[in-house]
């Protein structure tokens, strides 16, 4: 009998082992769809981004006009831009839900997969930040100024570092040029990191909602989960096209329709919605360096998740106390997101400070304690 090319060809064999004959737990729910949704988001962003880059000019005098030209004069340029801008929002919705799933079901115990995932998140955040600067509107310019300025809080080397990042003494043409270069490069780095992420995942196999070994109950990925993933793709694209066609500017800032002007500061400088929770944590500390450290800690704290797991059970499926804390954490993040969009005045300042404190308390203290408490309850 001739060998099956799908199983013998060096390249097809890799595809086969990852997407066709991959042994998959039979009971994984729709929460396990977000990994593939992130993959399709990345492909969509790279394709639309490539088409936009063909019409973009990375120059402070021309950037805003070139984006306007793309929307007005290029065939379906408006659609490509709207898909790209709103695709970023959906990318973040998917990654946050993917991380939430990881925390709820104890997926962080696959340490290598979890750590590469956090590095992917950081790279995605960097990509989104430099991309937001490119249209060179008011919020692009001032957002870039405020966020890059945070590096000046680093003792001794801070100011030098900022000027080195800017390529001058303020955000200007060199900054825009290098941000465009970075925005073009980073998605390919994300694609490479994704392969590493998947390599580590396929070493251990997928987790499942029960958090127990599923070796005795695995089914091939294709056709069962490939069809389930395609349904997810259809829903994602339906959501993306609905957003891009009916309310493309829903998640954007009206300030960005004004060309960048270094002499006029917008009344409220704020990042895109997906960074607002971190921005609220940054603003909740009245000290520059302290704020920067809290901002970094808000994401880097995820690296500690595997070490803070004290429960004998992997998932939260049968742990009602931990479930309550998890949903409290989700609610708290929504409150932080809302606070990040509000001006710095009473009562938003104190709400932001309390929400920031709660965020760190839940992750660092309450979840481990609750895990240990539930172990005790199991003995009775």
UniProtKB/Swiss-Prot annotation:
GO MF assignments: metal ion binding; ubiquinol-cytochrome-c reductase activity
According to the record, cofactor stoichiometry and binding are noted as:
Binds 2 heme b groups non-covalently.
**What positions does the entry give for a ubiquinone binding?**
202
Q: Which residues cross the membrane?
A: 34-54, 78-99, 114-134, 179-199, 227-247, 289-309, 321-341, 348-368
InterPro entries in the cross-refs: Cyt_b/b6_C, Cyt_b/b6_C_sf, Cyt_b/b6_N, Cytb/b6-like_sf, Cytochrome_b, Cytochrome_b_C_euk/bac, Cytochrome_b_N_euk/bac, Di-haem_cyt_TM
Location within or outside the cell: Mitochondrion inner membrane
Cite the entry's keywords alphabetically. Answer: Electron transport, Heme, Iron, Membrane, Metal-binding, Mitochondrion, Mitochondrion inner membrane, Respiratory chain, Transmembrane, Transmembrane helix, Transport, Ubiquinone
Q: How does it sit in the membrane?
A: Multi-pass membrane protein
Q: Which residues does heme b b566 bind? A: 98, 197
Predominant subcellular localization, coarse grouping = mitochondrion
Which cofactors are required for activity?
A: heme b
- GO terms (BP aspect): mitochondrial electron transport, ubiquinol to cytochrome c
Recorded GO cellular component terms are: mitochondrial inner membrane; respiratory chain complex III
Q: Which residues bind heme b b562?
A: 84, 183
User: Subunit composition?
Assistant: The cytochrome bc1 complex contains 11 subunits: 3 respiratory subunits (MT-CYB, CYC1 and UQCRFS1), 2 core proteins (UQCRC1 and UQCRC2) and 6 low-molecular weight proteins (UQCRH/QCR6, UQCRB/QCR7, UQCRQ/QCR8, UQCR10/QCR9, UQCR11/QCR10 and a cleavage product of UQCRFS1). This cytochrome bc1 complex then forms a dimer.
Q: Which family does it belong to?
A: Belongs to the cytochrome b family.
What further note is attached to this protein's record?
Heme 1 (or BL or b562) is low-potential and absorbs at about 562 nm, and heme 2 (or BH or b566) is high-potential and absorbs at about 566 nm.
Protein's job:
Component of the ubiquinol-cytochrome c reductase complex (complex III or cytochrome b-c1 complex) that is part of the mitochondrial respiratory chain. The b-c1 complex mediates electron transfer from ubiquinol to cytochrome c. Contributes to the generation of a proton gradient across the mitochondrial membrane that is then used for ATP synthesis.
Which named protein is this? Answer: Cytochrome b
